[in-house]
Regions:
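N-terminal prepro-regions of secreted/extracellular proteins
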Residues: 1-52
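Post-signal peptide N-terminal regions of Sec-secreted extracellular proteins
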Residues: 31-148
Length: 148
């Protein structure tokens, strides 16, 4: 019979049972403390000016910097595509960009780019053909910046 459950906070958590047996309590937080804990920031949705393309995503910390990832949706007509352009400022003061397209109205396209250590990131969603952006772009939306 259990007389009480006592959780001790500290480096090791133990559960004391009424019979006097001490059993270590393994929790997700205890095992996660030994591995790398990633931080995540969410952004979006960001839509094109005609609202037929939009993107949403997250920024996750990795051991080699940050990774911008998300999904690009297309709700346009025939022979049109949605594009997302990610622009980030590196810790060396240079701007880098990555562009992804989705021409499928039935499924979102997942995208991901490793940005390394950066100071800020912005995203915009545009409409276009299967080969290039033709216009109807949203403004640059700030999706992440160092220090908030």
């Amino acid at each position: 019979m259990r007389s009480g459950l006592r959780v001790l906070l500290g480096l090791t958590a133990t559960v004391t049972l009424g019979a006097g047996i001490v059993v270590p309590a393994f929790t997700a937080s205890a095992s996660a403390s030994s591995t790398y804990a990633a931080e995540t920031w969410h952004w979006g949705p960001t839509a094109s000016t005609d609202y037929k393309g939009w993107a949403t995503g997250k920024i996750r910390s990795t051991s080699s910097g940050l990774r911008v990832s998300g999904d690009l949706y297309d709700a346009g007509g025939a022979r049109t595509c949605s594009w997302v352009k990610i622009k980030w400022l590196t810790d060396h003061g240079r701007y880098r960009t990555a562009t992804f397209k989705n021409c499928s109205q039935s499924t979102p396209r997942a995208f991901s780019v490793n940005t390394g250590y950066m100071l800020s990131a912005e995203a915009k969603v545009c409409r276009g053909t299967s080969t290039r952006i033709t216009g109807r772009c949203s403004g640059w939306e700030g999706v992440w910046s160092q220090g908030g």
